[in-house]
Design a protein with these regions (language model features):
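Short, mixed-charge low-complexity intrinsically disordered segments
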Residues: 44-64
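Low-complexity, intrinsically disordered/propeptide-like segments
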Residues: 6, 21, 36-37, 47
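Short aromatic-glycine-(Arg/Gly/Cys) micro-motifs in beta-strand/loop hairpins
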Residues: 1-22
Length: 64
């Protein structure tokens, strides 16, 4: 499973996506990242593979 941290299209807020599902609405990227990493760690503890990606306009980066 891949958690994606990105900006919401309609405003300046950050969101966390997992597939087609959208979680949260964050004022800054740091809070979105913290929640995404926590969710990925929970998934790993449950025996599932998990990654966290930051998607920005010009590039993407895997951070966890």
């Amino acid at each position: 499973m891949a958690f994606e941290v990105c900006r919401h299209r309609h405003d300046a807020r950050w969101i966390v996506r997992l597939g087609d599902a959208v979680y949260g609405s964050y004022l800054d990227k740091e809070q979105a990242l913290l929640d995404a990493v926590e969710a990925a760690r929970d998934a790993l503890q449950a025996g599932r593979e998990a990654q966290v990606w930051v998607r920005e306009r010009s590039d993407s980066a895997r951070i966890f």
